[in-house]
Amino acid sequence: MAHINVEDGVPGIRSLVMFRPETGKPLYELAQVLLRGESTLTEAERELIAAYVSKRNDTMFCMMSHAAASRALYGDDKNIVDDVLNDIKHANISDKMKALLNIAGKVQVLGKEVTQQDVDAARDEGATDKEIHDTVLIAAAFSMFNRYVDGLASFTPTDENEYEAMGKRMAEKGYAAPK
């Protein structure tokens, strides 16, 4: 049960955005730009960053929904998502993506944990400054989203099938604030 009076049964951040649309709308707009806007990182990769940070923050709703969206976007390569979430070191992703996820993981702990060596390592693997920037911003934004969802104890479904449907919808439609 949520700590505040939100609509019963509406999961995660959606119930909080419905409670306070004037603050929720900009959050959805930020998610849309970060996860669906123009980027050389694929939408699947950006959703994976969101899921990875959410897992590290132990925010089940965000981890499950964004992992499902990433799986939907990866299509036939959807096993990549679970491989990363279970064991990033042995996951079948590029060294560039591993370097970017390393940065995201450090941002999740504390932004100041990211070192010049981390950035140089990502660049050495082919990451652009925009990709590094966007990785840091996705990690920072999802750390905030995770704290928002958990801090108000929003409803978290336990049925994995709900997340798969949610992920497909997010992959197809992106992020629009509820009306």
Question: Where are the model-predicted features located?
Answer:
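Hydrophobic alpha-helical segments
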Residues: M1-K179
